């Protein structure tokens, strides 16, 4: 996925949906922390979002997810799923603040 330089509300919602999916995949051990960092949860992405004036609440949740590896090293294993669920619930609350997107499709395939 290529992050556009001009991130609009649709892109913010797409980022949140990608974060939500990544957290669920982590919870179900379908991806690793390293993979989630390559996908979305990295300081590089956080900085890119900041530079493109993405809302603070989106940047904050992505930045917090960037710290998951450190968090997992200090909390007992039994609290990892609970931590992931808390983050997922926060993302869901943020998503509910957006109006429904009227566009027919979010993803457009360029068939050159």
Task: List the model feature ranges, each with a label.
Residues 1-112:
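Acidic, Ser/Pro/Thr-rich low-complexity regulatory regions
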């Amino acid at each position: 996925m290529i992050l556009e330089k001009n991130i609009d509300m649709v892109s913010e919602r797409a980022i949140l949906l990608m974060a939500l999916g990544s957290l669920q995949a982590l919870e179900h051990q379908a991806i690793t922390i390293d993979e989630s960092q390559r996908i979305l949860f990295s300081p590089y992405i956080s900085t890119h979002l900041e530079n493109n004036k993405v809302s603070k609440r989106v940047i904050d949740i992505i930045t917090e997810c960037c710290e998951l590896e450190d968090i997992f090293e200090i909390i007992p294993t039994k609290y990892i799923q609970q931590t992931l669920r808390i983050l997922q619930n926060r993302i869901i609350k943020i998503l509910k603040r957006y109006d429904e997107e009227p566009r027919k499709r979010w993803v457009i395939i360029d068939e050159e």
